[in-house]
A protein has these predicted regions:
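C-terminal-of-GTPase-core extension/linker across diverse P-loop GTPases
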Residues: 2-6, 17, 144-350, 362-363
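Conserved metal-binding segment of the jelly-roll/cupin
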Residues: 70, 359-360
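Conserved Switch II/interswitch segment of TRAFAC-class P-loop GTPases
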Residues: 40-45, 72-82, 93-155, 168-181, ...
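Glycine-rich, flexible loop/turn motifs
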Residues: 23-31, 38-40, 48-51, 80, ...
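Amphipathic alpha-helical transducer elements in NTP-driven molecular machines
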Residues: 32, 46-49, 62-68, 82-95, ...
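Short, surface-exposed secondary-structure boundary micro-motifs
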Residues: 103, 361-362
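Structural motif
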Residues: 352-357
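Conserved G1/Walker A P-loop phosphate-binding module
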Residues: 1-111, 138-140
C-alpha cells in the first residue's frame, strides 16, 4: 500500500520524507527539486512488539511496514500540464492515499511559490487541480456510458452516479466528501478518481507554533477546512522531525521530553497513515520472531493466515486467538489459557487489531 506525500513546492515535503524514511532524498530551496518520486518503506511504530519481545525474548522483531512516496511539488495549472503537472497526476494516481503537507510557518529565507503564507489557499490550489483532473475523467466516462446506454440500459445507473460526482466536483467538492450508497460506492471504486483517495493534512509549523499548536490561527484554519472532508490534521515541525530522525532512541526520548512531546510528529503521521489506508496488524509471537502482520480491516482468519504463507490459508483448520490486552494482563500464554482467554476461531472469524494468533492448518 502506497501513501503519496504531496504539496506545493518548498513546503517541507522532501524534508519530511527524508525524516520518515531516513533516505536522504535531495532537498533544496527551489521548486521541482523532486521530479521522479522517491519511495521509502517505513516500519510502523508499535510498542506492543517491544512488550511481547520482553515476554518471549525472540531472535528477531519485525514491524509492519507502509510505503511512502515523495511526489514532485504541484503548481496551479497542473491538470493542464503546467510545471510537472502530468507527472504529478500520474504519480498520485498510483498511490492509495494522500498525505498533503501544507506550510503554516513564516520564514523569509524559504521561498513561497505564491509569495506569502496562506495554508487554505495552498490546499485549495492542490485540491482544485485534483478536482479538474477528475472532471476530465468523469466527462470521458460519461461520454462512453451514454454511447453504451443505447445498447444496454444498465449503464443508466453509472450515468446517474457520474452526474452526481460531476455536479459536486464543479462546486469544488471532492468526491471523498460525497455520500454514496453501497451500490454507488462499487461504481465509484472502479473509476480510480484522485479525489476519492483518503487524505491526511500535515500542518508544517515553526518550533514556536508547535508549543501551542491547538491555538495556532493557521493550524486551526487548516482544521476547519479539513472538517469538510472528515479529514485529520497533524501539526508538526519538519525541522524538529529532521533533527529527531538522526538521533538514537535514548537521545530522541530526551529531546522529546525537553520539547514537552509524548511522541514524535512522524510517529503520529506513520500510525495515522496506516489507519488511513484501512490497515491494521495481527501479531505472532514466539522465540524465533515477534512480528506484526499487515491486513485490511475486516479480513477473515484464513485470509490473514495467507499473509504468512499461502499453504496456511489453503489448509486452514482454525486459529487460536488471544487479544494483546488479555495476554499482557495475564503475563504469559499459559496463564491466559488457564483463564479461558485463548479462543478457537473458525473460517468466518473477522480479525481484530492486536490479535495474537497461532494458525492450525493441514495440507
Amino acid at each position: 500500500m502506497k501513501l503519496g506525500i504531496v504539496g506545493l513546492p518548498n513546503v517541507g515535503k522532501s524534508t519530511l520524507f527524508n525524516s520518515i524514511t531516513k533516505a536522504g532524498a535531495e532537498c533544496a530551496n527551489y521548486p521541482f527539486c523532486t521530479i521522479e518520486p522517491n519511495v521509502g518503506v517505513v516500519p510502523v511504530p508499535d510498542e506492543r512488539l517491544d512488550v511481547l519481545a520482553k515476554m518471549y525474548n525472540p531472535q528477531k522483531i519485525t514491524h509492519a511496514v507502509i510505503e511512502f512516496v515523495d511526489i514532485a511539488g504541484l503548481v496551479k495549472g497542473a491538470s493542464k500540464g503546467e510545471g510537472l503537472g502530468n507527472k504529478f497526476l500520474s504519480h498520485i494516481r498510483e498511490t492509495d492515499a494522500i498525505c498533503e503537507v501544507v506550510r503554516c510557518f513564516e520564514d523569509s529565507n524559504v521561498v513561497h511559490v505564491d509569495g506569502n503564507v496562506n495554508p487554505v489557499r495552498d490546499i485549495e490550489t492542490i485540491n482544485l487541480e485534483l478536482i479538474f483532473a477528475d472532471i476530465e475523467t468523469v466527462n470521458k466516462r460519461l461520454d462512453k456510458a451514454r454511447k453504451n446506454l443505447k445498447a444496454d440500459k444498465k449503464y443508466q445507473e453509472e450515468i446517474d452516479v457520474l452526474e452526481k460526482i460531476k455536479e459536486n466536483l464543479e462546486k469544488g467538492i471532492s468526491a471523498r466528501a460525497i455520500n454514496f450508497n453501497e451500490d454507488e460506492k462499487a461504481i465509484v471504486k472502479d473509476m480510480f478518481l484522485l479525489t476519492t483517495k483518503p487524505i491526511l493534512y500535515i500542518a508544517n509549523v515553526s518550533e514556536e507554533q508547535l508549543q501551542d499548536a491547538e491555538n495556532d490561527k493557521l493550524v486551526n484554519e487548516v482544521k476547519e477546512y479539513a472538517k469538510k472532508e472528515n479529514a485529520e490534521v497533524i501539526p508538526l515541525c519538519v525541522k524538529i522531525e529532521e533533527d529527531l530522525s538522526t538521533l538514537e532512541d535514548d537521545d530522541k526520548k530526551e529531546m522529546l521530553e525537553a520539547l514537552g512531546l509524548e511522541e514524535s510528529g512522524l510517529d503520529k503521521v506513520i500510525k495515522r497513515s496506516y489507519d488511513l489506508l484501512g490497515l491494521m496488524s495481527f501479531l505472532t509471537a514466539g522465540e524465533p520472531e515477534v512480528r506484526a502482520w499487515t491486513i485490511k480491516k475486516g479480513t477473515k482468519a484464513p485470509q490473514a493466515a495467507g499473509k504468512i504463507h499461502s499453504d496456511i490459508e489453503r489448509g486452514f483448520i482454525r486459529a487460536e486467538v488471544v487479544s494483546y490486552k488479555d495476554l499482557v494482563e495475564q503475563g504469559n500464554m499459559l496463564a491466559a489459557k488457564e483463564k479461558g482467554l485463548v479462543r478457537s476461531e473458525g473460517k468466518e472469524y473477522i480479525m481484530q487489531d492486536g490479535d495474537i494468533v497461532l494458525f492450525k492448518f493441514n495440507v
